[in-house]
Amino acid sequence: MTALTGLSTLSALTAQSGAVSIDALRLLPALAPALGALLVLLVDALAPRRTLPHLVVGALALLMGAAGAMPGALSPAQEPVLTLCLPGGPDGACLWSAGPLDSTLQIGLLAASLAALLLLSDQWRDLPGDRAVDVALILASAAGGAAVVAARELGTWLVALELATLPVIALVVLRGTRRAAHGGMTLMMTSLLSFAVLVVGTGLWVMATGDASLSGTAIRTAWAEPDQRAVLVLAILTLFVGLGFKLSLVPFHAWTPPTFVSGPLPISALLATASKLAAVGALLALIAPFAGLADPHPHALAFVVGALAIGSMLVGTVVAFRATDLVRLLAWSTIAQAGWVVLPLAALTTVGHRASVAYALTYAAAGLVAFAVATAVRTAGGEPGSERGLAAYRGLARSHPHVGGPLILALLTLAGLPPAILGLVAKVVAIRPLLAAGLWPLAVLAVIAVVLGIAVYVRWIAVLLAAPEHRTTAASGNNAGTVVEVQVGPGALAVLSLGTALLVVASVVPQVLYGLLS
């Protein structure tokens, strides 16, 4: 379907204005994982019983995609990476445009996909399923995520967004359990509803602008006419609601906790990080052209964005406080953190866009570390991550500091507490665009959410630092306690090491991350 949409669009554009310029190297962030998925299936046909080649091919494809996005992220001229362009068209009439923020998001989501792949590789002995299919689905989702971030035409944008989502549904249900099937069905129904809303929003957008492109020229023309402006605002609000399902914003969040709990933990990590970064990129593609077009005072778009952000922050934080299961805590934390990611976008400024991307990357790094720890804790003889209760983590920082320490750092980052300076800076940067835009009520509510969030994460940190409980072994014949094991596989070790190092370095010198984004 993606290929047909792209071919039809390119054919129509070519007929109107001549040849389309295509630079395959600039498409590498999406092209590398897409080709990698095909190569994995080919390798599986030649060596069906080997798993290491699948992992190597998948990792190399994701690394190549991230390398392909580096020039755009580090461009000193801050010029977007353009391809699939028509000569002489408005705004270059490019279907692919990846500015520095877009390229940074592509690197982040490809890195998060690689982390999820490494975590999943540790569980291949315990989980049923075809390993080649697992890798191919993760690569397909990564290709869709990288494409939607840079897509500047609604047809491509919509198909790429679904490509980033649908493979994850299969990854959830491939576990083969009734619980996984329920989580996958919940995610699929949510995805279908989201797609329907997005299609309606797309139709309204074309009705308002007369164009399927996400170009500033078409938006400025529609904004100048009051009637078209009203339809355009309705279109962007409808599209925002559709993306609200992808971002787990309240009240579109109901699928998140059951899906996180029912699927394999590495896939939950993929949903919480890479999928969210792709949705943020899709949202930025819609909102970015509105910077500077809105009236100086808050209007409907800013109000809706701010209301959904604050609602997500407060609801997610309050419910997370009651969580006694680490995965449920991370699920409700994802809802709360999604509100923080969207909050600076209410300012409708480029500064707000940078703040949103910075917060999304900060959350993704901390979330991956937390999920890596969750995969390492299990009941004796159980599946990875099978022991998720609060009691199982009591004293983990003392008994297993190499696992408990990174989890404490991740929770401090999410709470915005020192010594995790990165989390504190991320929250300050997220609030600052609101103050500059005069949205003081939103800023005050955000501060309240910070205070509530501290209580959530400090509760878990206190458990991690407490004295470990004495647990009996099965050989003792005493059933007074459950034996909890900590087994860190090679993939989890890599994610823990790199993720913790990133959080430490970014907390010591946070200006490095925020300097790159500015």
List each model region and its residues:
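Alpha-helical transmembrane segments of multi-pass membrane proteins predominantly involved
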Residues: 2-518
